[in-house]
Amino acid sequence: MRLWKAVVVTLAFMSVDICVTTAIYVFSHLDRSLLEDIRHFNIFDSVLDLWAACLYRSCLLLGATIGVAKNSALGPRRLRASWLVITLVCLFVGIYAMVKLLLFSEVRRPIRDPWFWALFVWTYISLGASFLLWWLLSTVRPGTQALEPGAATEAEGFPGSGRPPPEQASGATLQKLLSYTKPDVAFLVAASFFLIVAALGETFLPYYTGRAIDGIVIQKSMDQFSTAVVIVCLLAIGSSFAAGIRGGIFTLIFARLNIRLRNCLFRSLVSQETSFFDENRTGDLISRLTSDTTMVSDLVSQNINVFLRNTVKVTGVVVFMFSLSWQLSLVTFMGFPIIMMVSNIYGKYYKRLSKEVQNALARASNTAEETISAMKTVRSFANEEEEAEVYLRKLQQVYKLNRKEAAAYMYYVWGSGLTLLVVQVSILYYGGHLVISGQMTSGNLIAFIIYEFVLGDCMESVGSVYSGLMQGVGAAEKVFEFIDRQPTMVHDGSLAPDHLEGRVDFENVTFTYRTRPHTQVLQNVSFSLSPGKVTALVGPSGSGKSSCVNILENFYPLEGGRVLLDGKPISAYDHKYLHRVISLVSQEPVLFARSITDNISYGLPTVPFEMVVEAAQKANAHGFIMELQDGYSTETGEKGAQLSGGQKQRVAMARALVRNPPVLILDEATSALDAESEYLIQQAIHGNLQKHTVLIIAHRLSTVEHAHLIVVLDKGRVVQQGTHQQLLAQGGLYAKLVQRQMLGLQPAADFTAGHNEPVANGSHKA
């Protein structure tokens, strides 16, 4: 809001507030002057103190207005920082007005003074307006012309207001979370019905308990006592039955919510671009998918159930409390604003802690996942104890945050518990006074005390609900952060021709990984893959060979240049079609915890078993598969753990061949095979794939030398192209690599794909 509007509105209200309060005070004290009222002030009879409270809040608003007017940049920030001050002032004045009403009721029974009621009502209207005006002044936009020059420069660096406040963000997250329950509207209606029935039944129990006591103590009638007891029994049975149904339905609703959330999150994750998985660790993503979604559904289901139940109960309890004694009801409600404020402060702090705990748990989960998935490596270095220590340190970080949560909860229980104790003692004392003075019966007092305990339990539950909801909302924000994330690389191509020759052209390709923005992996790389020909990529480790494979698979966007498939950019092809016509067999193939048949036919909707067997035979996998106990139905285990390295590579080769792909990529695909198996695979490549485009990355000379074209890469550039004999005749890098390998002077890594280029979850190959 603009500065001048906020100032005018605030000053106008202050004038109206002072005039109205003063007029009411004057008309209510026509029989004595102001000085006489001050000299002989009587708290039971005078409203001078309420008039003074009006002047005090007007002074606060005037000071806030001047501060914002003199410095429209820093002033609103200071007002936001002093929210607690205005809250406490309004809270104190509101409670004092209730006390004033009770004091007046002791000397004027009933209170029929219209001026007192006018001032009492106006006090609460003015308090609400003062609170809103304080908020209005705190929202004056920085940069609005101020009365004092230089104020804007003083506030440089003031944070923008584009981000919604935490309360608004939490409310939006909760609303979004509940929107996922729309398919269960019928269940929600049924659960709400039984919730209302159960809550109303529980609400009537204290009332009829009081009737039973009055039947004994006052009427001394066994009939009235028996009738009240029967009603209490029926109410208890009915409410228990309804509560059971309510709980069961709510549990079902939020179990369905959990499934829905996990499904949406998983679908969002698998649709992200490949670089997303380079930047986010697997353990963090798994933590979001498992622990966070479970926490969201469990906490939200439990707390919404409790919140709705207690809201209905509070409504009924308040009605009965006022019907029994409005004076005791006012005493009761004096303490609840304090409890609500304490709950609000605690809830905000707990929400922040909850986010930190979830992040710490995700880091611990990532450490555990990394260690367990690489257990053979850990054991080969005898590093079990050190890994356990690392995991323990991560858990200790979680424990430190848990201690903060425990301390915060302890202080919250102290504050709310002491406030409730003060309220209960006040009710007991003042209620005894009302019974002795004949203003209420002993049965009504006992019923009221029971209602007060019920109300206290409800408010305590609502307080814990708030902290629980904040914890659930904190986890939900992280879940929705991934659900709502739009991939930066969208696979929206639509080309899916019936016939594809398989010609691939790299034209001046320049490429940089997002995780290494200052390092160009490929620089103006150009070469072609021809149909029916085998092309080999050769070069030292880190030269960019596997990056070419990643680009051909359309895993990453290009920085410059383009990659064409049959003359069309690969990004123009349909995602499923592209990966059906281009098949990759990597050095470390990944098999899924499924049968061998399912692994070979992975990604294809329907594949005849005969085609699976034929592909396995071409990959020299059929023999060992038939030797397994369950043959093609054998479960490969997690990541193919039940198979040897060579067996996994042959199954992966069969998975690629079953597609009969126009373009086949072999990235170190025979590195784990023995000489005989490699020979058979080579025969399959050169003998059965004449009409296919084959790209090979290999370190063995026997694999490379038979290629129709060899492309030599060095430091991201193409330095040589030609056949094996041509490149040897030219000399240069290729000849050096061959010579060193033949003489045993260079490790085989010279011809490898290099293990520094990005693959999933942050490991890089170059």
UniProtKB/Swiss-Prot annotation:
Cellular localisation: Lysosome membrane
Temperature notes for this entry: Optimum temperature is 37 degrees Celsius.
Start and end residues of each ABC transmembrane type-1 domain: 188-471
Tissues where this protein is expressed: Highly expressed in testis, and at moderate levels in brain, spinal cord, and thyroid. Not expressed in monocytes but strongly expressed during differentiation of monocytes to dendritic cells and macrophages.
Positions of the record's site feature: Intramolecular salt bridge with Arg-57. Essential for the release from the ER: 17
Residues the UniProt record annotates as site (Important for the second trafficking step from the Golgi to the endosomal and lysosomal compartments): 45, 49
CDD domains from the UniProt entry: ABC_6TM_ABCB9_like, ABCC_TAP
GO cellular component: endoplasmic reticulum membrane; intracellular membrane-bounded organelle; lysosomal membrane; lysosome; membrane
Site (Intramolecular salt bridge with Asp-17. Essential for the release from the ER): 57
Record-level GO BP terms: peptide metabolic process; peptide transport; protein transport; transmembrane transport
Outcome after substituting residue 57 to A: Decreases lysosomal localization. Loss of lysosomal localization
SUPFAM superfamilies named among the record's database cross-references: ABC transporter transmembrane region, P-loop containing nucleoside triphosphate hydrolases
Activity regulation details: Transport activity is limited by threshold levels of luminal peptide. ATP hydrolysis is reduced in the presence of the spatial challenging 18-mer peptide by 50% and the branched 16-mer peptide by 75%. Transport rate of the longer peptides is strongly reduced.
Transmembrane feature ranges: 7-27, 47-67, 84-104, 116-136, 185-205, 225-245, 319-339, 416-436
Pfam families for this protein: ABC_membrane, ABC_tran
pH dependence: Optimum pH is 7.0.
Top enzyme class: translocase
Enzyme Commission no: 7.4.2.6
Domain notes: Divided into an N-terminal domain (TMD0) comprising four transmembrane helices and the following core domain (coreABCB9). TMD0 is required for lysosomal localization and LAMP1, LAMP2 and YIF1B interaction. The core domain is required for homodimerization and peptide transport activity.
Quaternary data: Homodimer. Interacts (via TMD0 region) with LAMP1; this interaction strongly stabilizes ABCB9 and protects ABCB9 against lysosomal degradation. Interacts (via TMD0 region) with LAMP2 (isoform LAMP-2B). Interacts (via TMD0) with YIF1B; this interaction allows (but is not essential) the ER-to-Golgi trafficking and strongly depends on a salt bridge within TMD0.
Protein name in UniProt: ABC-type oligopeptide transporter ABCB9
Organism encoding this protein: Homo sapiens (Human)
